[in-house]
Amino acid sequence: MKTSFNVIVGLTLLLVLGLLPSCGGKSNSDVNKKPYEEVAKFLVADESLSPVINEELDAYRMRRKDLKIDTLYTNEYDAVDMLVKRETWIAFTTRQLTPNEKQILSDRGLKPNVMPLAYDGMALIVNKNNPDSIIAANDFARIISGEISCWNEIDPSFPADTIRVAFDNPKSATYRFCSDSILRNKEMKTTGNIRAVQTSREVIDYVENHPDAIGIIGSLWLNDQRDTTNAVYGRDIRVLKVSKGDVATPTNSYDPSQYNIAYDNYPFIRTIYAIVTDPRSQGEARGLGNFCILPDGQLVFFHAGLFPARAEYSVRDVIIH
């Protein structure tokens, strides 16, 4: 018996020189309201990114054992707000800055460096007792918009149970992705059968304990087999395959793997960014951001199951006898 499948077998990470600008010159009076060192104490990030940001920090500390930067995991809205208000020099997000945010930073004498780091899939998870294994992207959009609320509205053979939808919180990167990308700039429903449970870990717990639930989390939470408190690995949870077609079938539905993200087979893909405003070219925040786009930093994303933004790769057919 032969089984043929595609795997990513090569990964050459590119170091692109000349893309790490430093910020010089004097800051205006608004920038100097807080001491530099006070602002440099910690990084901020959307909570859904915490597993891979922790890994990046661990890897960076191998180089910089004297690193004095702590983490504050919050929601994406507050993370960007803190960056703009000059309460941190670095934020990890899944969106770029708006023109208004760029202007505010410019008025404060700061030049943001927005660096794409990796690509992540927004994974849909269900309880293992749920009969569903595939879903069309447009059906999930109908669920989170409130158009449908029962499983048998997706497939008449499914039970008539209410679909319980779990996400982290209304200020998160997940919520924004659902509203902006899946619902095309329409508000996601947040009442009734759709509920915020605050964190990605709580989404996983909720789905594991509710057979009729569906949750949405970053795919980076699926892959860490070393920390079962963070991951879906070993839990009573199934990851749905999602189709771009109007009707999901086993042949047109894909999971959020590196391969399917790289080849754009999976419909729900987002970009992870580091946004750095550190005015010092040798500052810790700028050093951390730069590390994330260097080969060692990109390998951290690769090993976390994400697809690195700066990578060359090859795909071959592997035959197993």
Task: For each feature predicted by the language model, list its residue ranges.
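C-terminal motif of bacterial Sec signal peptides marking the signal peptidase cleavage site
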Residues: 18-22
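Pocket-flanking alpha-helical
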Residues: 76-108, 223-227
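Exported/periplasmic ABC-transporter solute-binding proteins
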Residues: 23-77, 81-84, 118, 126-321
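Periplasmic N-terminal soluble interaction domains immediately after the signal peptide in Gram-negative
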Residues: 112-113
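Core hydrophobic alpha-helical transmembrane segments of single-pass membrane proteins
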Residues: 11-15
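Bacterial N-terminal signal peptides that target proteins for export
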Residues: 1-10
